[in-house]
Swiss-Prot record:
One Pfam family from the record: Antimicrobial_2
Family of the protein in this entry: Belongs to the frog skin active peptide (FSAP) family. Ranatuerin subfamily.
Name of protein: Ranatuerin-2OK
Keyword Nucleotidyltransferase appears in the UniProt entry: no
Tissue expression per record: Expressed by the skin glands.
Cited function: Antimicrobial peptide. Active against Gram-negative bacterium E.coli (MIC=12.5 uM) and against Gram-positive bacterium S.aureus (MIC=50 uM).
GO biological process, one term: killing of cells of another organism
GO cellular component terms attached to this protein's record: extracellular region
Keyword annotations from UniProtKB, A to Z: Antibiotic, Antimicrobial, Disulfide bond, Immunity, Innate immunity, Secreted
Lineage: Eukaryota, Metazoa, Chordata, Craniata, Vertebrata
Statement: the UniProt record of this protein carries the keyword NADP: no
Localization in the cell: Secreted
């Protein structure tokens, strides 16, 4: 359903955002 698709997309965006944040905090190359 559309809701499931939206939930999946939100999870992916959140995961990508967290990865970038960890990257900046640790000072490693992304």
């Amino acid at each position: 359903s559309f809701l499931n698709f939206f939930k999946g997309a939100a999870k992916n965006l959140l995961a990508a955002g967290l990865d970038k944040l960890k990257c900046k905090i640790s000072g490693t190359q992304c």
